[in-house]
Design a protein with these regions (language model features):
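N-terminal beta1-alpha1 ligand-phosphate binding loop
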Residues: 2-26
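FMN-binding flavodoxin-like domain, especially the glycine-rich phosphate-binding loop
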Residues: 3, 14, 29, 47-180
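A short beta-strand-loop structural module common to alpha/beta enzyme folds
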Residues: 29-41, 129
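Structural motif
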Residues: 42-46
Length: 180
């Protein structure tokens, strides 16, 4: 089994593309194939000690799911399945996609929901990201003036995505026991 599991939920395909891009940076022994949570199981997630979780923010700052017209469901339906998973021995890195121009009052809020979910179950979250260079009003994904994970805005700052991903992957690599 690979050392790192990568799970995501995507409505438009952007989060899926980022998850697959991250996977391509690692061999199969290091990282499993990126998997949409609507095809995952709690047992599969529980089997990894290192996780990368990705989400977009939909609706009024919500996790992707059936209530936000995410075909096949998403984090909204999957998180209840994870409620009994012990995250206390897990290292988790988060990434979130959002649109700071169109939704400045709920920018990447869904990533904040994922963060609070895994922390409440004992996870160690790594890969906090500076909030500089983003223009938004409020976000549930901010803790101590930093984002709880990597934030990407594919609508307004797509040109910064590759550099941000490279820097973030270097940031989390040692936390996952990987070379930088």
């Amino acid at each position: 089994m690979s050392r790192i599991g990568i799970f995501f939920s995507s409505s438009t395909g952007n989060t899926r593309r980022i998850a697959k891009f991250i996977k391509k940076r690692f061999d199969d022994e290091t990282m499993a194939d990126a998997l949409n949570v609507n095809k995952a199981s709690a047992e599969l997630v529980a089997g990894y000690s290192h996780l990368i979780l990705g989400t977009s923010t939909l609706g009024a700052g919500q996790l992707p799911g059936l209530s936000t017209d995410c075909m096949g469901g998403g984090w909204e339906e999957f998180l209840p399945q994870l409620s009994d998973v012990d995250f206390s021995e897990k290292t988790v890195a988060l990434f979130g996609l959002g649109n700071q121009d169109k939704y400045p009052d709920e920018f990447v809020d869904a990533m904040g929901e994922l963060y609070h979910f895994v922390v409440a179950r004992g996870a160690t979250v790594v890969g906090q990201w500076p909030a500089d260079d983003y223009d938004f009003i409020v976000s549930k994904a901010l803790v101590d003036d930093e984002f709880v994970g990597l934030v990407l805005d594919q609508e307004n700052q797509k040109n910064l995505t590759d550099a941000r991903l490279d820097a973030w992957l270097k940031l989390i690599a040692p936390k996952f026991g990987l070379p930088t």
